[in-house]
Amino acid sequence: MSSSSKIDSEKPVMVSESLFSTKTPIKTVKRQIFSSSPKPESVIKLPERFEILEEFFNGLDTAIRLLKLKGSSTTYANICPKIEYLTNRIFSYDHLAQMKHIYPEAIELKRVLKFVEDTCCMKPRLHIKLNTDAIVVEDTICGTKYMELRKVFHSKLVDFRKAHPKDEIPKELLPEPFNSPQRDSYSGIVSVGLGEPKLEVGGFDVHMEEIEQEEQDVNKVIPDSTLSHIESRIVETPVKDLSTPSKDLSTPIRLMSATPTLQLSKRCIELTPEGGDDNSLRSTNSLARGPSRSLNFDTFEEDAIEKDDIGNESDDKGINYEEDGLLQSVKGPSRSLNFDTLEEETIVKDDISNESGDEKSNYEGDNASDDDSLLQSMIERPKTEPEKHNLPQLVNLIHRVFHSTNRTVITKEELLYKIIANQINITDRREVEEQLSLMLQLVPDWISETKASSGDLLVRINKMSTAETVRARLEEATSHDISLIY
């Protein structure tokens, strides 16, 4: 009994040991299969630019899977930071275009519009998707399809490296407006050699090749006589084009030089004594300009002697210039610096300055009535045909300025500025002030001027009156004044 019980007690121990001993080799064999499977594959060394692109593709795969797990949209704006974090490199649209060229079946790009709350506008976004249906895998283990995509992408890089060992990877076109601006749109048409110098403007190279191709086609079809005629016309055309800028360049120079030349010649002709009477050569227009003072550093002693002689002669003549003095008070004196004037012009200017000095003494006591005399001279002065139409046009402009601002009161400075800015043919502020003062007197019930407590002049209009009635009254008043003058 004791021997049989010992045998029975030893059997289960042996069975348990045998069971444990048989399971252990199975696990080791399975681990050896999985660990030894990638060893037979030979890895081909790729250049650095190809390895960087492969890293970007692997990062793209990882970023898209992470965004899907998070529930976020797989747009370029969301994917780019993750790829740059995984690869520690800058990821751009050019890299995406190169990956699209290598594996177009797996990378799907789509342009979508997203509403931006800050700007309340629709902004385009680039949606990126990896198409796992591009490959067929028998094993459906999680992650196998994405790993197979990486292997296929690597094999395609190897194939491209073998076919084009020295070429760069082309860039596939992306949906607009995500194409790189530096990329040449004619890159697929024009091929430039590696040793040839490249132009800075890519479109110019294409344009020159198209012109050469057209010339070759013309040489094949058109006979020699017609071709020579066409070439002569082509040669003549640039000559006309080159002459046009010269005219344009000469025009402002001619205008700029003509204006001072006319003024100087007019003074010399009208005021320079040539053996006759000086009074017969003087005109009221030249005196209306007022005395002009110049600085001449060339002659000092001779000018002083001549000035004394001319001053004595002008005192003996005693010419009355009351009307010219009034015009001079309107226009005011003008001063200029002239370093190259002639001696005759200097003599005439001193003569005018001496005469104007006598006239100033007659009008110094009338400062209180300057405004009244200015307005009276503007009314009594004969108006030409263009000046008759200025006041109605000014009414339209003032009416438009007040209605555009939705105000009935505006400062005089602002009104004058807007009139000069909106009226092309008016450049003189004094002319606008004269017309405005005349209008204040002719139609006071429509436009009036008051002085504010701050000292500014305020102009007010009556918006109840229409512009048509004001123009009619103004035309009637101006025509009546002109008829009285004539």
Curated annotation (Swiss-Prot):
Keywords: Cell cycle, DNA replication, Nucleus. It is found in: Nucleus. Residues 281-294 have a biased composition (Polar residues). InterPro entries: Cdt1 (IPR045173), Cdt1_C (IPR032054), Cdt1_C_WH_dom_sf (IPR038090), CDT1_Gemini-bd-like (IPR014939), WH_DNA-bd_sf (IPR036390). The keyword Cell cycle applies. It holds the Pfam family CDT1_C. Induction: Repressed by ABAP1. One of its GO terms (biological process) is chromosome organization. Residues 273-294, 348-371 are annotated as: Disordered. The keyword Membrane does not apply. Coiled coil: none annotated. One of its GO terms (molecular function) is cyclin-dependent protein serine/threonine kinase activity. Member of the pre-replication complex. Regulates endoreduplication. Involved in the coordination of cell and plastid division. This is CDT1-like protein b. It comes from Arabidopsis thaliana. The lineage of its organism: Eukaryota, Viridiplantae, Streptophyta, Embryophyta, Tracheophyta.
